[in-house]
């Protein structure tokens, strides 16, 4: 049997990722022996969801470690399947530019991130294949799995261009948002498998939950723009920014999307006022996100339903978590642990809100008036039924 080193680099990379993916797949296969197809797919989706959450946090660690260019090509590292094979190239790059982005440690961080991303992609491919074959038995459309597979391919392209375009801020931010969309797609599928409706009353509809999710996603995009432009420390102090309530800001340059990292749209260095504008936009819009989440949490708490109240507590807890980690980033000088906690909290908010919307959406059709003929006069009368929780 040929050794792994005997294969071409790209094939070695595929084989290596396949071997890594065997671990979760074997665990899933052994644990779900004899289970129904829906149970097996639900468990596989939950496993993929867990790894996707980890991938988002580790992606933040990769970016915060300045390891995004630890391997400056894609998908391998200097044409090799791992930094082991690229040891000589990495040493040469580090010797040529000791303070540059290429080191052995950064190369490993970047490649571990890629391995994990490829494993997630492979698990999604397996789930999509099974969903397509067992489409008649699924409680929801097989196109959800197909859409997730298509989206993870798009995410792979974002990952590629993040590296090949040298951390182009718009691409890096799109890569972050794409990860959040992928997380939401997996949460939706997991909830559809379980089909647990949650009836919302007191003027709260699924549309309202979706609106709050949109506000949170916009706030995450602004936070991603802060991180990718390294504008976290553009403001020191809180609640003021650099001892001013309204500092000088250049929103025009700060929110020019088509530009290189650290440069304006004209190719000059990005001025400090632009970085302040980027930071302040995230800080100010946080007030809108705060208001939306507090309102939703309060309305959920008033539902007089144990499940709704759990969602209220989860959202309130994540809101406190985000406020504490966000403030820690500013007042403590952007410590790694606070930055990672902030990224994890953002992903948690997306997951909880998506789950809430999915469960409310399942319940909503059952609350629509059902018209049945009157046994007396043949008139149509509306009857309203509530689904089982």
For each feature predicted by the language model, list its residue ranges.
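Transmembrane alpha-helices
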Residues: 1-36
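Alpha-helical transmembrane segments
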Residues: 21-31, 128-129, 187-190, 296-298, ...
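N-terminal signal-anchor transmembrane alpha helix
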Residues: 44-66, 215-226
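Membrane-interface loop-to-helix entry segments
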Residues: 8-17, 107-126, 170-184, 277-295, ...
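Membrane-interface helix-loop-helix junctions at transmembrane boundaries of multi-pass membrane enzymes
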Residues: 129-146, 203, 297-315
């Amino acid at each position: 049997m040929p050794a792994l080193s005997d294969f071409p680099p790209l094939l070695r990379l595929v084989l290596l990722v396949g071997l890594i993916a065997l671990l979760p797949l074997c665990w899933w296969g052994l644990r779900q022996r004899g289970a129904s197809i829906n149970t097996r797919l639900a468990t596989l989706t939950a496993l993929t969801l867990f790894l996707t959450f980890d991938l988002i946090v580790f992606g933040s660690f990769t970016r915060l470690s300045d390891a995004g260019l630890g391997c400056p090509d894609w998908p391998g590292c200097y044409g090799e399947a791992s930094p082991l094979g690229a040891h000589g190239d990495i040493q040469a790059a580090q010797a040529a530019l000791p303070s540059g982005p290429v080191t052995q440690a950064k190369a490993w961080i970047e490649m571990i991130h890629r391995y994990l991303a490829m494993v997630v992609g492979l698990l999604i491919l397996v789930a999509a294949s099974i969903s397509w074959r067992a489409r008649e038995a699924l409680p929801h459309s097989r196109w959800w799995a197909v859409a997730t597979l298509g989206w993870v391919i798009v995410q792979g392209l974002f990952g590629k261009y993040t590296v090949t375009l040298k951390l182009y801020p718009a691409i890096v931010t799109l890569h972050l948002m794409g990860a959040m969309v992928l997380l939401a797609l997996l949460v939706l599928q997991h909830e559809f498998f379980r089909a647990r409706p949650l009836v919302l009353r007191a003027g709260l509809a699924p549309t309202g939950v979706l609106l709050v999710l949109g506000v949170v996603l916009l706030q995450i995009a602004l936070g991603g723009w802060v991180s990718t432009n390294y504008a976290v420390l553009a403001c020191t102090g809180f609640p003021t920014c650099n001892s001013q309530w309204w500092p000088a800001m250049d929103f025009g340059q700060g929110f020019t999307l088509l530009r290189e990292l650290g440069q304006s749209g004209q190719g000059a260095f990005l001025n400090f006022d632009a970085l302040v504008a980027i930071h302040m936009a995230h800080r100010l819009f946080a007030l809108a996100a705060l208001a939306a989440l507090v309102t939703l949490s309060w309305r959920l708490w008033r539902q007089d339903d144990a499940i709704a109240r759990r969602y209220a507590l989860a959202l309130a807890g994540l809101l406190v978590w985000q406020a504490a980690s966000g403030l820690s980033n500013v007042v403590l000088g952007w410590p790694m642990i606070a930055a990672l906690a902030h990224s994890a909290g953002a992903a948690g908010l997306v997951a909880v809100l998506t789950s809430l919307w999915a469960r409310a959406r399942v319940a909503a059709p059952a609350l629509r008036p059902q018209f049945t003929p009157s046994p007396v006069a043949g008139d149509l009368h509306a009857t309203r039924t509530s689904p089982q929780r």
